[in-house]
């Protein structure tokens, strides 16, 4: 399977920070990292900072404050949101004949309800680490000039993480 998009974290870092067994094939993980980057990480960083980080990763030049940001803050949020997105698909298998529960050699597969509970726990972990990321960026915005930079039509950096039933925070552009 050809992968053309860069991942913000490596397989080694994902496995070091996640509860995922080393037995799970990387092909089941990486697409969820891409989705996590699109759904949570890019909106938290803003498009300009996200593109700067991804460009540095592609070039192998990620260093200094940017490396600290990725390794200490972005990586943890990415890991937990990736698990949140992946768990439902790691429990099932989509085949030509339909959707089936996976079988395992060394245990009993969990129910979809149990998988959902575990996934929700992963989402809560991801939200915690995403808030830490946002707080860090707000406190250190002078270290990341791209964080406050938004060109017309770009995704601005979000300063809001948790979503509840009623948000009374004012919105300013």
Where are the model-predicted features located?
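Catalytic-loop motifs flanking and including active-site residues across diverse enzymes
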Residues: 78
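Conserved short "hinge" loops at termini or chain/domain junctions
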Residues: 1-75, 89-97, 101-121, 125, ...
